[in-house]
From Swiss-Prot:
Family that this chain belongs to: Belongs to the prokaryotic/mitochondrial release factor family.
Reported modifications of this chain: Methylated by PrmC. Methylation increases the termination efficiency of RF2.
Subcellular location(s) of the protein: Cytoplasm
Highest rank taxon of the organism: Bacteria
CC annotations in GO: cytoplasm
Sites of N5-methylglutamine modification: Q251
PROSITE patterns: RF_PROK_I (PS00745)
UniProt cross-references to InterPro entries, sorted A to Z: PCRF (IPR005139), Pep_chain_release_fac_I (IPR000352), Pep_chain_release_fac_I_sf (IPR045853), PrfB (IPR004374)
Keywords: Cytoplasm, Methylation, Protein biosynthesis
Species classification: Bacteria, Pseudomonadati, Campylobacterota, Epsilonproteobacteria, Nautiliales
Described purpose of this protein according to its UniProt entry: Peptide chain release factor 2 directs the termination of translation in response to the peptide chain termination codons UGA and UAA.
Annotated protein name in UniProt: Peptide chain release factor 2
Gene Ontology MF term list: translation release factor activity, codon specific
Length: 368
């Protein structure tokens, strides 16, 4: 890095800070935090424990955003002042130090930028994830199980909890279908970027001639809806089937006749749940899954209307990412148009950078 590149980076980071400031409005956050402080001092604040808990959660989130913003803003300002002084005095040692620290400074600003992007209406909700293999039998089913493990490891890295709702093993290897909830802060905000078709290219472990195969799997992510969100599902619009639970056994699933499959006839959406011995509980969970999927579909339609996207691009039917394991190793995301070579780490759940690059690319697209 040289002085010109560093000055260009500072301009870019200053612009980002300004954009973030316009979005989060620090003055309004400070005002709201003062209001919350007054509410907390009220003697009847804890009378409604649920509401008090929500306000505390809001306070923690706003305090964290404000703190990170101020830290990033002052870091950029300090770096700019030091750069101008070192340039004027031709202080090579200080300039080299600034150049070395440039990636850390950029990362700090990117982190608050991501935090800002995860302040949408549903971003703080838990995520319901369904992975379904594409055509291709064992190949695709094995790919679906690799993706499933990737998300489990991602959740583990974040300290998030996972609850398996439906797990159906493949006949030879992999899985036919899996649905699970990832519970944690901003789980949906992050994982909404995973909605779509994931493509794998590799030398098949199931091909005796060791040929290259391409496999596909769809990942569907929706926010776990709570009772505040009103989604009406009429009985005439659904078909409910019961079936015998089958899966990995043990911690994954109970082998009973209580598994439930619900088909939403108008949209063709199918949800399944078999994680409980009680058919009633499985039905309630399946209905919640269906509501979440329908809600996600509505969100997609609204986004499409705002962005003028063709209806055919809505939902989970478009390819978002390729994972190439042979003849070279690379993961490439079509939305950020960025490529990554640490394929092994990515498949082990190290996907934050990919997701963040997608969120940044989409935010930049919206701001144009």
């Amino acid at each position: 890095m040289d002085s010109y590149e560093y000055s260009e980076l500072l301009k870019k980071l200053e612009q980002k800070i300004e954009n973030i400031k316009n979005i989060i409005k620090p003055d309004l956050i400070t005002k709201r935090l003062k209001e919350i402080e007054q509410l907390e001092n009220s003697p009847d604040f804890w009378n409604d424990a649920k509401k008090a808990g929500e306000i505390q959660k809001e306070k923690n989130r706003l305090s964290r955003i404000l703190e990170k913003f101020e830290e990033a803003r002052s870091s950029v300002e300090d770096a700019k002042d030091l750069f101008e002084m070192a340039t004027e005095e031709e202080d090579t040692e200080t300039l080299n130090m600034l150049f070395e620290e440039a990636p850390t400074l950029e990362e700090k600003v990117n982190k608050i930028e991501i935090e800002t992007m995860l302040s949408g209406e549903n971003d703080d909700k838990n995520a319901i994830v369904t992975i379904h293999p594409g055509a291709g039998g064992t190949e695709s089913q094995d790919w679906a199980s690799i993706l499933y493990r990737m998300y489990l490891r991602w959740a583990e890295r974040h300290g998030f909890k996972v609850e398996v709702l439906d797990y159906q093993e493949g006949e030879e290897a992999g899985i036919k279908d899996v649905s699970f909830i990832i519970k944690g802060e901003n789980a949906y905000g992050y994982l909404k970027a995973e909605n779509g078709i994931h493509r794998l290219v590799r030398i098949s472990p199931f091909d005796s001639n060791a040929r290259r195969h391409t496999s596909f799997a769809s990942v569907m992510v929706s926010p776990e809806v709570d009772d505040d969100i009103n989604i009406v599902i009429e009985d005439k619009d659904i078909r409910v089937d019961t079936y015998r639970a089958s899966g990995a056994g043990g911690q994954h699933v109970n082998k009973t006749d209580s598994a439930i499959r619900i088909t939403h006839i108008p949209t063709g959406i199918v949800v399944q749940c078999q994680n409980d011995r009680s058919q009633h509980k499985n039905r309630a969970t399946a209905m919640k899954m269906l509501k979440s999927r329908l809600y996600e579909l509505e969100l997609e339609k609204k986004r499409a209307e705002q962005e003028g996207i063709e209806k055919s691009d809505i939902g989970w039917g478009h390819q978002i990412r390729s994972y190439v394991l042979a003849p070279y190793q690379q993961v490439k995301d079509t939305r950020s148009n960025k490529a990554y070579s640490n394929v092994e780490a990515i498949l082990d759940g190290d996907i934050d950078k990919i997701i963040e690059d997608v969120l940044i690319a989409e935010a930049e697209k919206e701001s144009k």
